[in-house]
Amino acid sequence: MRATLATLAVLALATAVQSDSRARIVCYFSNWAVYRPGVGRYGIEDIPVEKCTHIIYSFIGVTEGNSEVLIIDPELDVDKNGFRNFTSLRSSHPSVKFMVAVGGWAEGSSKYSHMVAQKSTRMSFIRSVVSFLKKYDFDGLDLDWEYPGAADRGGSFSDKDKFLYLVQELRRAFIRVGKGWELTAAVPLANFRLMEGYHVPELCQELDAIHVMSYDLRGNWAGFADVHSPLYKRPHDQWAYEKLNVNDGLHLWEEKGCPSNKLVVGIPFYGRSFTLSAGNNNYGLGTFINKEAGGGDPAPYTNATGFWAYYEICTEVDKDDSGWTKKWDEQGKCPYAYKGTQWVGYEDPRSVEIKMNWIKQKGYLGAMTWAIDMDDFQGLCGEKNPLIKILHKHMSSYTVPPPHTENTTPTPEWARPPSTPSDPSEGDPIPTTTTAKPASTTKTTVKTTTTTTAKPPQSVIDEENDINVRPEPKPEPQPEPEVEVPPTENEVDGSEICNSDQDYIPDKKHCDKYWRCVNGEAMQFSCQHGTVFNVELNVCDWPSNATRRECQQP
């Protein structure tokens, strides 16, 4: 069994390395687009599947009480077979990945902060996710928590560590299922958000791809009119906005330790609109706005203040005798337009073309769009789907190069997360069958480094009882019993480990080892050679920093 699993791990790694050279075209699909009126209505049948490598159904959520999957629109997604109709597209497009996103701006952050706070609620969520993906035949999960550690959104200081734990535990669960599910995340590029909530090197190692939301970098909240996805810094960018552009934002992810071939660059298929201050005749970038208006006037199909889909912009701005004046941001490489008190900054074929060439120059993994349903899919301004066609033209013929590692700033010791266990091929095999598991002292030893994640067993649960289609709380799922693993040479009470409120428990005999409860099972992890487990900080540290006197000597 050990040899078989080791072989599978090697094959999986070889497959991943091979697939990394293929650029990604990630298309987010907002399921509520079906409710837009008239020509704005967008259904699953309108998705240009052949233009995407990954399509992500948006969104599912998390329940308030038991931290399980929440189906936000059960009538559309379940009763009308939205999920199944979406994943059934695979039959005619077998090379495309059909994933689902959890989160989104409207979901807030407090529920997610609560979910990751305790290992029990994380496990509840993970079991629910596994059941959900199996039931509706998705190819993976995209994490769109906006944002870990964001106090202004109901987050907690501990979210940064706990989000990483969630990602690691999801990865282990997905590997154990053995269906090749992908795990990705949509992330911000503002430095303060990364500092608050993201262990960048570790997340980039665990996730298949990082979808950088390189848009909404300006908006009505800023107090001035501007394009919201500028490629480069402009002369008027000051203070917090000086580095808030696509080029500097992606560089920041690299600088913090993320390989370039894990980064997917976000391209908005929509614009941000503004209402200018009364009597303001200055229509340039950074001009004064009426902030109390909340943004520009709603457009006819998306019907949201301060927000226009690309097809709503092109039908208005590019129309003959429309009265709109169209301009170009020379440094930011984006168009903007104005008429009267209305001002909108957006992306068009010219700006998207520039960004595609820039992605290839930088060696990034590909491009993603929020959202595919806001392209000119009806051909109201000319050909259908002009923006996604540009993404496909460039990315389908582009081979992603190996990552470049220069200019990476080492993570300070105090900011590093606790050590993570190694690949299972280096330690005991993951059980792949289920038999009775005793309730007392199951223990496992895993040889580890501080950079790679182990894949412990994940309980299989009853699909029907583990997914909430409405916010009412459901009974806690009952996991099936797992294989008993022989105890290790270092006897520890497994029930003591798993009943503890602590995520990390130092080994009583060995200074360089510690224990964690993973999916109800006590697992032992080892620090790198020459380091010991720091009980106070829950990290592997130099012996001189050890809080246990007996561990202060190497």
From Swiss-Prot:
Record GO biological process: chitin catabolic process; polysaccharide catabolic process
Residues annotated as binding chitin: L76, D77, G103, G104, W105, A106, Y147, M213, S214, Y215, D216, W370
Main location as per UniProt: secreted
Glycosylation sites: N85, N303, N545
InterPro entries: Chitin-bd_dom, Chitin-bd_dom_sf, Chitinase_II/V-like_cat, Chitinase_insertion_sf, Glyco_hydro18_cat, Glyco_hydro_18_chit_AS, Glycoside_hydrolase_SF, Glycosyl_Hydrlase_18
Annotated region (Disordered), positions in chain: 398-494
Compositionally biased residues, Basic and acidic residues: 467-477
Expression sites by tissue: Epidermis and gut.
Family indicated by similarity: Belongs to the glycosyl hydrolase 18 family. Chitinase class II subfamily.
Protein name (record): Endochitinase
Originating species: Manduca sexta (Tobacco hawkmoth)
